[in-house]
């Protein structure tokens, strides 16, 4: 019963975030943002797989490039809408992560929803940020920082946190600083406190 209630809670929140994001993307959902999108899709089409680990931007951006490889499978006229959809998906995941972690910490679903809405409704340039897969690194950064600061998430989903840290580290030029200590924190069996993430979170 509790599982079903939680399932419907997260499904309802995801639906709410989706409506808000579609409203925010109005007028831009069918257009590619000029910030990074042109090059990343061209690389995916012209240099499949090898461009995933490209340093063309001066740093690794693995997840956006993997997403670009998936998007270019569809006809080119759908590139913009799929790009916006993928980016919105990560805003939704960031919002749900904030809700989950805040709920475990404060115990209030009202404050938790408010905190998650702050993430989904964060002011941003509509075309440059909301529908730009090149900027999903920021959603990942939010997920890593919030999940890593939640003792409950760390203890219950430690392997998932390592995966998030690795993906973020390979997709964000700054997050690699935090990724290394987070991974070592969990791999070091002799560490006195496996849940002590003050150092890596300070790096974040």
Identify the residue ranges that each predicted region occupies.
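Start-transfer (signal-anchor) and selected internal transmembrane alpha helices
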Residues: 1-20
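Helix-to-loop transition at the C-terminal end of transmembrane segments
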Residues: 19-38
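Membrane-proximal lumenal/periplasmic loop motifs of glycosylation machinery
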Residues: 26-32, 45-89
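Transmembrane-helix motifs of polytopic, lipid-linked glycan transferases
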Residues: 85-107
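Membrane-embedded helix bundles of polyisoprenyl
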Residues: 111-126
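Membrane-interface transmembrane helices that cradle and orient dolichyl/undecaprenyl
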Residues: 140-160
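Membrane-interface alpha helices of multi-pass inner-membrane proteins
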Residues: 159-184
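Perimembrane helix-loop-helix junctions
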Residues: 178-204
């Amino acid at each position: 019963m509790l599982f079903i209630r939680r399932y419907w809670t997260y499904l309802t929140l995801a639906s709410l975030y989706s409506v808000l994001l579609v409203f925010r993307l109005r007028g831009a959902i069918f257009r590619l943002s000029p910030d990074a999108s042109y090059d990343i899709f061209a690389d995916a089409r012209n240099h499949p797989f090898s461009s995933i680990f490209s340093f063309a931007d001066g740093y690794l951006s693995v997840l956006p490039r993997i997403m670009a490889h998936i998007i270019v499978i569809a006809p080119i006229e759908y590139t913009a809408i799929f790009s916006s959809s993928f980016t919105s998906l990560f805003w939704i995941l960031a919002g749900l992560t904030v809700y989950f972690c805040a709920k475990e910490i404060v115990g209030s679903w009202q404050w938790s929803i408010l905190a998650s809405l702050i993430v989904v409704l964060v002011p941003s340039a509509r075309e440059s940020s909301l529908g730009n897969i090149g900027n999903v690194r920021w959603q990942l950064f939010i997920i890593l920082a919030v999940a890593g600061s939640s003792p409950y998430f760390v203890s219950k989903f430690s392997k998932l946190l390592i995966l998030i840290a690795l993906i973020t580290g390979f997709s964000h030029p700054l997050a690699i600083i935090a990724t290394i200590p987070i991974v070592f924190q969990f791999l070091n069996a002799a560490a006195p406190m496996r849940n002590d993430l003050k150092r890596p979170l300070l790096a974040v």
